[in-house]
Swiss-Prot record:
Classification of source organism: Archaea, Nitrososphaerota, Candidatus Cenarchaeales, Candidatus Cenarchaeaceae, Candidatus Cenarchaeum
Gene (UniProt): pcn
Entries under InterPro entries matching the protein: DNA_clamp_sf, Pr_cel_nuc_antig, Pr_cel_nuc_antig_C, Pr_cel_nuc_antig_N
The keyword Lipoprotein is assigned to this record: no
Protein name: DNA polymerase sliding clamp
Function: Sliding clamp subunit that acts as a moving platform for DNA processing. Responsible for tethering the catalytic subunit of DNA polymerase and other proteins to DNA during high-speed replication.
Domain of life: Archaea
Species the sequence originates in: Cenarchaeum symbiosum (strain A)
Molecular-function GO term, any one: DNA binding
Amino acid sequence: MAFSAKTSGSDDLKAIISAISTLVEEATFVATAEGITFRGMDPSHVALIDISWPNSAFEKYECDSNIKFGVRIDEFTKLIKRADKKDSITISVSKDSMLLIDIGSNKKYKIRLIESSATDTPLPKISYDAKIELATTSFEKILGDVQVVSDYLTIKAKPTGVEFAGKGDSGEAAIDVKKDDDSMEALKVKKESEGTYSLEYLNPIVRAVGGAAGSVTCEFSDAKPLRVEFKVANIGRIHFYLAPRVSS
């Protein structure tokens, strides 16, 4: 068999698929000897997710030739949700274009692969002026605090700290996080920067990955896309790009 990947538990794969499901209904994965990658953009081209999962993250990994396989995310999600936390999950591709999913020692599923309609999506090439690293639990709470009153998050970064704010019809919210705050793991500001981003996109991706990620890094500049990196122990890279809100 040309391709087979086995996880030691189910949490990482669930986090990846949950993150992808916030943006797209169909996903095309690329498997090589180095690992599995995915890159996709939502239909409105507001958000992009880029995932790299190295072979070293798997309990067992085999890929003797490059392969692309496309799946419907809702179908894939239903199956991997049947796995308990400690269950291993093995995915492989059969000769008759089926994705084989083995869960634990006694569950076996097959789903039909779909034709890939994905095109190569380049990553934004941006030089950022502000970089913030926070505990994921703290960032998720901040987003929830702002979403109580607003659909958008405004981030203002200064060398001394960061303000997360939002404004809506019902009121306003502002959360200040100083550079020496326990939740602030790192702060680098070349230039004071401000950006406003949709919580409709940002909140679901943070919730999806949050449980598996210890920290989150946000990079932005004035009126530039937000770049979010999740640090997950067994996953090489999850990057999320979100276009800024443009004031009319």
